[in-house]
Every structure is written in structure tokens, then in C-alpha cells.
Amino acid sequence: MGCSSSALNKAGDSSRFGSGVTSNENSSTVEHNKFCVDQPKPCTPGGEAAFHGNTQRESHPSLERPKASVVPTANGVKSYHQPSLANDETPGKEATDHSRPTKKIEPLVQGGECEQPQPGGKDDMLGTEEVKKDVEARTEVPSLKGDAEIKPLRLSSERDSPGAPQAGTMKFLQTAENILPLETTQELPPKEATGKGAQPQILEAIPKENSSPEIEGIQSAESSGQQQLVEAPGEAEQPQALETVLKENETSQMPGRSQPVPTPVMNKSPCEAPDGLRNAHEPQVTGGNRVQPAETGETAAKVEMAREIHPDKEEQHIEGETGEKVEAEMKNEKESEEAETKEKETGEAVDLGAAGAGDRRA
């Protein structure tokens, strides 16, 4: 420690007597020697002279270097004049300042490592480079963290298969916040659209179902009407039949006609029916409604039954049309009754024909 402080003091004295450039160069060489001491040497007077001689020897080649008062640095331009003035003014402070870093650097020197610092510009460059490296290292660390966080996503997307449930669950959990709203927005409108589209269909189906009884009633009414029309003649034939019947009735009621008028085809029978019976069996027209004539077979049977039950009326109607009034059957019935009573009383048969002839003569 004592050697280094004395050497520095001597170097400061030499720098005072030299020029500004030489003092700067000597200070730089002193700094070189300060950092480049390989091993601590014992404090001997001969060693101090040798150390001082070495400093002078090293200072002479420095004179041969080109003189430059300005050195470029990373942050700007730096001159050597200011440090020389500072060194001239405070030599004691420099000695004390140089002694302090020697204490801190001694462990490095003992380790056998000799780091020769370069001039101020290069030191600044190294400092900036180290800062850049630190910044890059710090930026690389989060980037590595980001890659580590992103890799599971890539692996999950690449390994996403039915056989890898963990990757699928990781992907689902990581993308649930983004995917769920999209799925809801994409799926809900179709559902709402289908619901709205289905409601009119349901409403249309409900009125159809509600109206089905009415339709069935209408169909049943139509079917019953069709059955009646099937049993009766066709609709197109009905107006024609009605027209023919009305025409025949009009012709039969016309004056000057004493002969009976033939009935229409539907009411035709082996015997010509009188006008009254014919009108009774003819269909009657009611206001605006369709007239459905009775069945032909039923009408014929009814006419025959009426003739069998009321033969006298038929004959009377026929005789009325011809203008003759004869009550033959009434007389025949009376004669038959009288003959029966006589047979019971006398036991003799009476000729009905003779009795009838006598009655007619009388």
C-alpha cells in the first residue's frame, strides 16, 4: 500500500513539470500501472526506484504517439485538457482516490487476472455494450417466458385430437372467453330464427287441427249430399225433370183437354195415375232450395200401394176426367154383402150379375 501511494505521488510531481499532453499521458500510464500490477511487491527503496524508472520508460514511448486532444466516445467527444487541470489542482485527492480502488481490486490481482482498461472512449463503448447486452438479456427473458406460455397453446393446437383430452381441455380453458360469446352469437340467432319460423308453422297447424272438425262436418255433409244425389238422379238432370214436370202440369190444366196427360218418366207406372196422385208424388219446389225427388223405386211402390188401398178413388178421378159418374164398385160391394146375407138366410146362391142387372134397370 505504501509503495503504490509513493509511486503515485512521484508520478503527480512529474506530471506538474511536464506539458499538458505529457501529463495526460503520464496519468494514463499511471492508471495502467495501477491496474496491471501482477503481484504485490515488498516495500524496498530499490523497488521504488525501479518502479519510478519503469514509469519513465513507459512515458517516453508515449511521446512518439500522435498527439490528440480529442477522443471520440459513444456518448460524444471528450478532451484530455479538463482531466489534466483537475489533476494539477488536486494531486492529493487523486492519490487518495487511486488508493481506494486498489483495495477493491487487490483480490482480482491476487487471482492472477490482469485486466488492462482501455482509454476512456473504449471504456464507454464497453459500458454501453454491456448495458445493451443487459437490456437484450432482460428482453429475452420475458420473450422466453412468453414462448414458454405460448408453446402449450401450439402443442394443444397441434395435438388437439380425440385421443388427447388434456390438450383439448387446455385449449378450451384458454379460449373459452373468446369462443363462448362467438358460439352464443352464432348459435342463438339460428335458434331464435328457427323458433320464429316454427311458431307460424305451429300456429298454422293449430288452426288446421281446429278447423279439421269443421272440415270433417263439411265433408260429411257433402258426402251425405253426394249419397243422396247418387240415390237420386244427377244435379244436371234435376232442373230438366222439374221443367218437364211443370210443363206437363201446365198442359194438363189447360182448358179444352179432357184426355189424361202422361206423367214424366220418373213417375211412370203400368197404369196412368190421376192428376192428384201425380201431383202428390211430384217433387215440390221450395223457395230457392234444391229439390231432391224421391227414389223411383219407392215412388212406384207407394203408388201401387195407394192404388190397391183406394181403387174407388182412382176410378172416381178417372170418371171425373171423362165426365161420367158411376159408382160401380160401391154397388158391387153392396150386392156382395146382400148375397152373403141371403145365402146365410136361405142357403141359396144368388147370381150377382142378375142382381146387378136388375138394379141397373131399376
From Swiss-Prot:
Modification Phosphoserine occurs at: 161
Compositional bias (Polar residues): 16-30, 220-229
Biased composition (Low complexity): 110-120
Bias type Basic and acidic residues, positions: 55-67, 90-106, 121-139, 146-161, 304-347
InterPro entries linked: Glu-rich_5
UniProt entry keywords in alphabetical sequence: Phosphoprotein
Highest taxon above the source species: Eukaryota
Gene name tied to this protein: Erich5
Protein name stated in the entry: Glutamate-rich protein 5
Region (Disordered) location: 1-169, 183-362
